[in-house]
Amino acid sequence: MSIYISISHRYLLHEAGRATDKNAQYAQILEEANAAVADGFDGANLNIFDGNNQIDAWSAYWYSREYSASSKTVDDLMVARQDPREAIYNYNGADWYDEPSRLGLMTPGDKEAAGATSATNFPLWFLNGISGVKIPSHLMSKSELYFIIAEVKARLGQDAKADFETAVKASLADYATVGATEISNEDVAAYLAGETATKFAANPLNEILVQKYIAQTRDEQLETFNDMRRCNYLDGSYPVAMTNPNNTQAGQNRLPLRLPYGSSDVLSNPNVKEAFGSGNDAGKYIFTENVWWAGGNR
């Protein structure tokens, strides 16, 4: 039951921007999230990958093409915090390629790296189910639940430090299951007492969202996409800047605000067809029409 209660708080958090009484919404989220903790929630995971018949979807995609890469956007956040997860995230592929990757870390907008295969650094967990790495895939991680609790407390003006640290510890433990990299208790303590603590003290909500972004880089990027849209609507900004110059055109946003409808929906549903548009405007709604919980009308 704790799994279903926990996952429901994603949706309640998405709805906060639409809530007439946001504090009441946050209080409900906090009460129910704490109930999930009390009920023993430790993550909703798919622990089924055996390297034979079951291969993690992210790993299967990377393995078939080898052009997914570690991003400088994420790595810069880790380096600035002396993050022990950085070596796991920014793996140079030496043991896989038989030498360090040719192009290294991927900078957003780098067209050569974007078109290259077997040439960039990549997260070690891409070997999940392929090369002796057997780790779960998250439907919802333990760290996400505690980040939700920490965010809600910060928005309510409450002390969020303990829940924030629990969330970060859960993410560090999750990363440490990948490869041979060890993250000791001393490493964890030093990390939480270092630049991370300084940034949290300066702006708790900002650092909660940044650390959630780092944690969900593992395999929860869809929820990160939701957080970007949610926070841009709720706060007017998101603390991690997207720097790919190819995401703008003529000064207009080209980072999708929503996922597109499928062709069968467009063809068979007149309401969807109207939203999709026609001619030169066909499909542009994904860049201009927010989803309803992020301020849109559709």
Mark where each language-model region is.
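Acidic helix/loop microenvironments that form the catalytic cleft of cell-wall polysaccharide enzymes
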Residues: S2-R10, V168-Y175
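"A position-specific structural signal for the A-helix of alpha-solenoid helical repeats
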Residues: I3, I7, Y11-H14, S141-E144, ...
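Short, charged low-complexity intrinsically disordered segments located at boundaries
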Residues: Y4, W62-S68, G179-A180, G236-N247
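TPR/TPR-like alpha-solenoid repeats
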Residues: Y11-L12, R18, V152, A215
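Hydrophobic-face positions in mid-chain alpha helices that act as interaction patches
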Residues: A24-Y146, R155, K161-Q211, A215, ...
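C-terminal functional modules
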Residues: L172, V188, L192-R298
